[in-house]
């Protein structure tokens, strides 16, 4: 995993002295990213979004991320969102509301903390799901590209790795992670796949 990240930075000509905002949900992919970037001694700042959608579970995710960052000496911030109210006001889905809220905050914090990039934990399985969803929606050629590894200031260094490889890294390094119960809910398009 460390080699994957080093290769990604080299391939995309990203200076290792740059500053990286790491988006951390507490799931296996984001914990892998956070641990690997810390291990590589890169300049990082962790951000965790509490969307207040899963009651105690959301708060437990937040506490887990705080403890992880404290253990590894990683500076971090948390922001609470009223995602349901935002979705209602905008007339959009909860998924879209959470996406808009988090990326707006990530960019705001990137500038405030004088960092260069926002790093998110999308992996190969996410890429395959996105392509499938786009095909089902009758996408054009543009939609067949799926998730790009670099878009503006957003980096996705794990796109070449499967969830299985990410879990192996977690186990090898004896790292914990949280599982979002909504991943099992058929209320979200991605989960129906």
Predicted regions and their residues:
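Core alpha/beta nucleotide-donor-binding catalytic domains of modification enzymes
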Residues: 1-193
């Amino acid at each position: 995993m460390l080699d994957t990240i080093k290769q990604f930075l080299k391939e995309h000509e990203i200076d290792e002295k740059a500053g990286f905002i790491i988006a951390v949900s507490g799931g296996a992919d984001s914990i892998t990213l956070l641990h690997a970037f810390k291990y590589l001694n890169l300049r990082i700042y962790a951000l965790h979004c509490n969307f207040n959608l899963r009651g105690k579970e959301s708060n437990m995710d937040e506490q887990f991320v705080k403890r992880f960052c404290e253990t590894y000496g990683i500076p971090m911030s948390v922001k609470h969102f009223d995602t349901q109210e935002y979705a209602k006001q905008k007339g959009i889905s909860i998924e879209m509301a959470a996406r808009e809220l988090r990326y707006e905050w990530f960019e705001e914090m990137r500038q405030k903390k004088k960092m260069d990039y926002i790093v998110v934990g999308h992996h190969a399985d996410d890429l395959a799901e996105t392509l499938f969803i786009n095909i089902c929606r009758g996408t054009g050629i543009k939609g067949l590209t799926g998730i790009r590894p670099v878009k503006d200031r957003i980096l996705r260094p794990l796109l070449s790795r499967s969830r299985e490889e990410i879990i192996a890294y977690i186990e090898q390094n004896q790292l914990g992670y949280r599982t979002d119960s909504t991943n099992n809910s058929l209320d979200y398009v991605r989960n129906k796949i």
